[in-house]
Amino acid sequence: MHGILSPGAWAFIAYVLGAVALCLVMLGLGRVLGGRSHGRAKNLPFESGVDSTGSARLRFPVKYALVAMLFVIFGIEMPFLYLWAVSVRENGWAGFVEVALFVSLLLAGLFYLHRVGALDWSPERRRRKPRD
């Protein structure tokens, strides 16, 4: 007669408990054996012996955030295209039409971003105004 849990479940529970116990032991040893220093220099950043000057908070233009978002959006297309490429024979013409539609939507988005100036890094005075 088997108990409520199978032997595999007991092994999994033992594994999780062991991992948690190992983490707690390592955290506890670090707390007990770690040195403590209190003072004004404790909260200063370490700069290889050089005294830091100025603020560490730099302001980045919004363009960097825009480029990061565009990279994420257009970078997501690669796994989809790869999955289509490895299964092109199984998908047939229906898969080809779907991928063609997907790529055309991405290209339309890219042309739109170019038209509104999201990809233009030139200074404001040299920018070309979009035609309406």
Swiss-Prot record:
It is found in: Cell inner membrane. GO terms for cellular component: NADH dehydrogenase complex; plasma membrane. It is a multi-pass membrane protein. Its EC number is 7.1.1.-. GO terms for molecular function: NADH dehydrogenase (ubiquinone) activity; NADH:ubiquinone reductase (non-electrogenic) activity; quinone binding. Keywords: Cell inner membrane, Cell membrane, Membrane, NAD, Quinone, Translocase, Transmembrane, Transmembrane helix, Transport, Ubiquinone. The keyword Ion transport does not apply. It holds the Pfam family Oxidored_q4. It catalyses: a quinone + NADH + 5 H(+)(in) = a quinol + NAD(+) + 4 H(+)(out). InterPro entries: NAD(P)H_OxRDtase_bac/plastid, NADH_UbQ/plastoQ_OxRdtase_su3, NDAH_ubi_oxred_su3_sf. The chain crosses the membrane at residues 9-29, 66-86, 93-113. NDH-1 is composed of 13 different subunits. Subunits NuoA, H, J, K, L, M, N constitute the membrane sector of the complex. NDH-1 shuttles electrons from NADH, via FMN and iron-sulfur (Fe-S) centers, to quinones in the respiratory chain. The immediate electron acceptor for the enzyme in this species is believed to be ubiquinone. Couples the redox reaction to proton translocation (for every two electrons transferred, four hydrogen ions are translocated across the cytoplasmic membrane), and thus conserves the redox energy in a proton gradient. Belongs to the complex I subunit 3 family. PANTHER family: NADH-QUINONE OXIDOREDUCTASE SUBUNIT A (PTHR11058:SF21), NADH-UBIQUINONE OXIDOREDUCTASE CHAIN 3 (PTHR11058). This is NADH-quinone oxidoreductase subunit A 2. It comes from Pseudomonas paraeruginosa (strain DSM 24068 / PA7). The lineage of its organism: Bacteria, Pseudomonadati, Pseudomonadota, Gammaproteobacteria, Pseudomonadales.
